[in-house]
Every structure is written in C-alpha cells, then in structure tokens.
C-alpha cells in the first residue's frame, strides 16, 4: 500500500520524493516488461501511487505515474472497488482514471472490503450491517461504470460471499462483463466456381462491458479474424486473414462491418 524510500523512516517525504518515485516506478515497470513479454502486466491505479503514505488526497503526480506504467506496457487495476471513503477508497479520482483509460488498457476490479472482518457498514454508501450483498452490489455497480475486463473475487470467504450472497451478480458478469465478441452477420456466396474470386462480408459486435485487449504490447495484435475454405474432410485448403478487422476497437455493442 506504500513505498519506503528511507530505510530509517519508512514514511519520510522530502524534496526528492517525487523525483525518486518516478525513477523507481520507471525502473521497476521496465524491468518486469523486459522479462515478462508474453503475459499482461498490471499495476494499481491509486491516488498516492508509489508514495510513502497510502491514503490522503490525490497526489498531483499520481496520474502521470499511471500513464508512465501504461506506456511501459501495463494494464491497470484497483483493489478498492466498493469503498467510498474519499481518503483511501474508490472515489472521484479513481473513477476519472478508469474513464481516461477505458478501452485503451484492460481494467481489473477487486473489492476493497473483506465482509467477514471489515466494518463495511460505516462506508458512506450506507451498506447495512449484516448485509454483505449490499457491498457486492456496490462493487458490481462501480465495476460496470469502469467497464472492467475482469472481476477478482479473491479467495476463501470472499469468493463464497459472491456466490452465496450475490450469485445473480456473478451470473450478470458472466453474461455482460469482459469482452463478448461475435459475428452477427456473415455474407458469403452459396456457390463459387473454381479459380474465381469470392467476396466475404462480415459484421462484428462486442456485447461485453470491456474490450478485447489485442493492442497490449505482450500480444501485439496477434489475434486476427480469418476465413477458411474447408474441404469435405474438414481440412482447411485456403485461409484468408482479414487484416482490416481489429477486434480491440470493437466496443459498446456497436456494429463493425468489413
């Protein structure tokens, strides 16, 4: 939740802190990106990112630090969804960051409250004591607003709470969350002559909240739309890759025709 730059005083802040924060974040994110080239990398978007203290008003440099991590190949996540405290929860600053990077990098959600041990009923949202489903609903609503690609249900009792207290929300995310790509229209001729040219038209939609992160540097647009001419034995005799189709641009259920 915080980063210490002084071994003698882990919460120390001085005139060099902001410079050192940026240098350290740039170094560590580039180091990970250098060695983890095939899997997505993720960093928390937090109002005091990389700071010696873990709460308070948003640091004016935090937004640029998030952008720095993203430029080095990172996705973003928050582990404070459902918390509405303006000092350390998921509030105006975090929502603005999510809106800024929506459909550009994946956003991952984790709830802030452990309902079995945290006093979630003191939250400004007015969650009722003894009603963990209120917390789950708050987390879900913030996730929908942020258009998250993934919801982290944690482990143990937290996972059980999602399935026992708010299973309908789990079902909704399964059907609505992340990316949901499908061709809602494909036009091909029913007969073709050998050696002739064939025109294929397709229309695609993403029915999910999120987007398909084909643009991540670790994936580098490797997922493509392709059409194949298949013989009677189901063997592809010819494959055509449509280079004009880019699934990372398909968002908000809009039709994309090619």
Label every PLM stretch briefly.
Residues 4-157:
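Catalytic-core regions of glycoside hydrolase
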Residues 136-191:
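Catalytic cores of secreted or luminal carbohydrate-active enzymes
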Residues 196-200:
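Structural beta-strand segments of beta-rich domains
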Residues 201-205, 226-228:
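Residue-level recognition of well-ordered beta-strand positions that form the cores
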Residues 206-210, 233:
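Short, acidic/polar linear motifs in exposed loop/turn regions
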Residues 212-226:
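Short coil-to-beta strand junction motifs in C2/discoidin
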Residues 237-258:
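A beta-strand/beta-hairpin structural motif
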């Amino acid at each position: 939740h915080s980063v210490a730059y002084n071994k003698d005083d882990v919460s120390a802040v001085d005139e060099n802190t902001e410079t050192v924060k940026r240098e350290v974040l740039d170094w560590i994110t580039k180091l990970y990106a250098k060695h983890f080239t095939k899997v997505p990398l993720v960093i928390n978007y937090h109002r005091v990112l990389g700071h010696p203290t873990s709460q308070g008003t948003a640091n004016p440099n935090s937004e640029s630090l998030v952008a720095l991590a993203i430029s080095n190949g990172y996705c973003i996540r928050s582990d404070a969804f459902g918390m509405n405290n303006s000092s350390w929860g998921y509030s105006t600053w975090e929502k603005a960051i999510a809106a800024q990077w929506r459909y550009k990098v994946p956003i991952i959600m984790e709830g802030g409250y452990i309902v079995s041990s945290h006093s979630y009923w003191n939250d400004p949202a007015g969650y009722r004591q003894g009603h963990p489903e209120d917390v789950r609903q708050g987390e879900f609503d913030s996730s929908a607003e942020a258009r998250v690609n993934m919801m982290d249900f944690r482990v143990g009792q937290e996972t059980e709470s999602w399935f026992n207290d708010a299973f309908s929300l789990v079902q909704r995310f399964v059907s609505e969350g992340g990316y949901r790509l499908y061709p809602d229209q494909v036009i091909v001729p029913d007969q073709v002559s050998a050696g002739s040219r064939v025109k294929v038209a397709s229309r695609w939609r993403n029915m999910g909240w999120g987007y398909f992160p084909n643009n991540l540097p670790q994936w580098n647009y490797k997922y493509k739309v392709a059409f194949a001419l298949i013989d009677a034995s189901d063997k592809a005799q010819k494959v055509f890759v449509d280079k004009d189709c880019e699934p990372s641009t398909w968002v908000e259920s809009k039709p994309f025709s090619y």
